[in-house]
Design a protein with these regions (language model features):
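Low-complexity, intrinsically disordered regions enriched in charged/polar residues
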Residues: 16, 32, 60-64
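Anion-binding (especially nucleotide phosphate/pyrophosphate-binding) glycine-rich loop
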Residues: 3-6, 38-127
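ATP-dependent small-molecule kinase catalytic core of the GHMP/sugar-kinase superfamily
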Residues: 2-6, 10, 16, 21-31, ...
Length: 169
C-alpha cells in the first residue's frame, strides 16, 4: 500500500430543531437547527493498493455499505478505505454522517483535492441519500464537517451554513 490518508469527523448533539432539516419540511416551512459537535469521532483511512489497481474500490471494516458507496462515488482505481468510530451505533449522534464526512475527506485528499467544509457535507449527504437511499436531513453532515457549534441553518434546500464565528465554541 502507498499513500495512506486519515481523516476524522465529530458526531453532534441536537439541541433544538431536530427533524426540521429533513425534506420535505424545510422546503415548505424552512428549517432551523441548533446542533453542537462533540468529542466522539469517526476516523476514516483511505489508500491506494497497487495489488488492487483494477478494482474501483474495496471496503474494509465497519460501516461497509457506506464505505463502499463512498468508494463508488470517488471512482479512484485501486483505492481501499475503512472507517471506525468511538461511539455506539444508533446512538442518535449523527454517527453515519460523521463516518460519511470522514470518508469524503480522506478520499478527496487521496485524489489530491481540497474540498471546503460545505462541499464535504454536501458530498457526504449525497452519498447517503442518493447511493444508499437513506432519507435524511442536513444537520448531521454539516455538524460533522464544520465541527464546533452551534450549527444553525434555515432553508436547507440551499445547503447549510454554520453560525457566525462569535457563536461558535
Amino acid at each position: 500500500m502507498t499513500r495512506a490518508i486519515v481523516a476524522r469527523a465529530p458526531t453532534r448533539l441536537d439541541l433544538a430543531g431536530g427533524w426540521t432539516d429533513v425534506p420535505p419540511y424545510p422546503e415548505r416551512e424552512g428549517g432551523a437547527v441548533c446542533a453542537v459537535a462533540i468529542t466522539r469521532y469517526a476516523t476514516a483511512a483511505a489508500a491506494l493498493d497497487d495489488r488492487m489497481a483494477r478494482a474501483v474500490g474495496v471496503s474494509v471494516g465497519s460501516q461497509d455499505e457506506l464505505t463502499a458507496a463512498a468508494l463508488r462515488r470517488a471512482r479512484i482505481p485501486g483505492s481501499v478505505a475503512s472507517v471506525v468510530s468511538d461511539y455506539p451505533a444508533s446512538a442518535g449522534l449523527g454517527g453515519s454522517s460523521a463516518c460519511g464526512v470522514a470518508l469524503a475527506g480522506a478520499l478527496a485528499m487521496l485524489r489530491g483535492e481540497a474540498l471546503s467544509q460545505g462541499e464535504l457535507a454536501a458530498l457526504s449527504r449525497a452519498t447517503e441519500v442518493e447511493e444508499l437511499r437513506v432519507p435524511g436531513g442536513y444537520q448531521d453532515h454539516y455538524a460533522a464537517a464544520y465541527g464546533g457549534g452551534p450549527i444553525a441553518r434555515n432553508r436547507f434546500r440551499y445547503g447549510g451554513e454554520p453560525a457566525p464565528a462569535s457563536l461558535r465554541a
